[in-house]
Amino acid sequence: MTTKSLIITNSRYSEIVDIKSIVFFIANGSYCEIVLNDKRKITASKNLHWFEEKTANGFFFRVHKSYLINVLFVTKIFNNEFKIELSSGIVIPLSRSKKLDFWQKLTSLGLID
């Protein structure tokens, strides 16, 4: 991934965020909430698709229509429940249609055999 940071903009301010500190993005209509590894949350005036494009070819994967996660923060995958637990303890849904692609992403990054 060539991008090392993102400029997150909302109606009040713009903030430069190290992309490695982003745990996940969650869609909120035409806005997006970004959760960082220090547990801070930032609301951005861009939609989830915009962030998906900006983080393509990196460690991010769209696991559900509402969630884009940093796979480096995955600690547990609940196979039969279609859920993923992140290092913060937050459990994120895994779309049935994305499960195989998710495993392939983890494999391609060398995170699993």
Task: Describe the residue ranges of each PLM region.
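Conserved binding/recognition cores within well-folded domains
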Residues: 1-87
